[in-house]
Amino acid sequence: MTKVAVLKQDGSQAAELELNDAVFAIEPNNAVITDAVLMQRASMRQGTHAVKNRSAVSGGGRKPWKQKGTGRARAGSIREPQFRGGGIVFGPTPRSYAYRINRKAYQLALKSVLSQKVAEGKLVVVDALSFEAPKTQDFKKVLANLSVDTKTLVVVDEDNENAILSARNLTNVQVMTTKGINVLDVVNADKLVIVQSSIEEIQGGLA
């Protein structure tokens, strides 16, 4: 079992926690991590690109010249693709880029990135993050006590609204609930701060 220190909000050690090696100490699978990141990034695309084909371009209802006798190539509309200002052939249309990978593959990717953070010493476990009211300065003070000063992902309980609101104005800090933890955000974070109860919930869902 991998052991990590459980810190208080003031930075002192409260206890020691044994992590489940099946979740936090596996051999990372880089191929599956890549698949999961690409899936999430593809799902984030708006896919609103569009151009007009010949039926969508305005004008061109009149035949530009008669069919025969002019020596020119026949044409039925000045909005045909070969004309300047004409429609586009096989251009991009709005579509969704979202796709899914297997649930087990995604879970393996999540366990892989969590294991990487533990191996690199970038996981910080806190016994609790409690604030009397939403206040950014209080949240910054806690991060300073935990020696966290880089791009950070903080994972808290579902009902910890004060912590979520306190971090909204911090540019390098992202706070999410346990159910929202995902591969892309864990990969992008330099530090991972997780509340102890969330660690137990993550292990219960992935072990």
Curated annotation (Swiss-Prot):
The keyword Lyase does not apply. Residues 48-75 are annotated as: Disordered. One of its GO terms (cellular component) is ribosome. One of its GO terms (biological process) is translation. Keywords: Ribonucleoprotein, Ribosomal protein, RNA-binding, rRNA-binding. InterPro entries: Ribosomal_uL4 (IPR002136), Ribosomal_uL4-like (IPR013005), Ribosomal_uL4_dom_sf (IPR023574). GO terms for molecular function: rRNA binding; structural constituent of ribosome. Pfam families: Ribosomal_L4. Belongs to the universal ribosomal protein uL4 family. One of the primary rRNA binding proteins, this protein initially binds near the 5'-end of the 23S rRNA. It is important during the early stages of 50S assembly. It makes multiple contacts with different domains of the 23S rRNA in the assembled 50S subunit and ribosome. Forms part of the polypeptide exit tunnel. PANTHER family: 50S RIBOSOMAL PROTEIN L4, LARGE RIBOSOMAL SUBUNIT PROTEIN UL4M. Part of the 50S ribosomal subunit. This is Large ribosomal subunit protein uL4. It comes from Leuconostoc citreum (strain KM20).
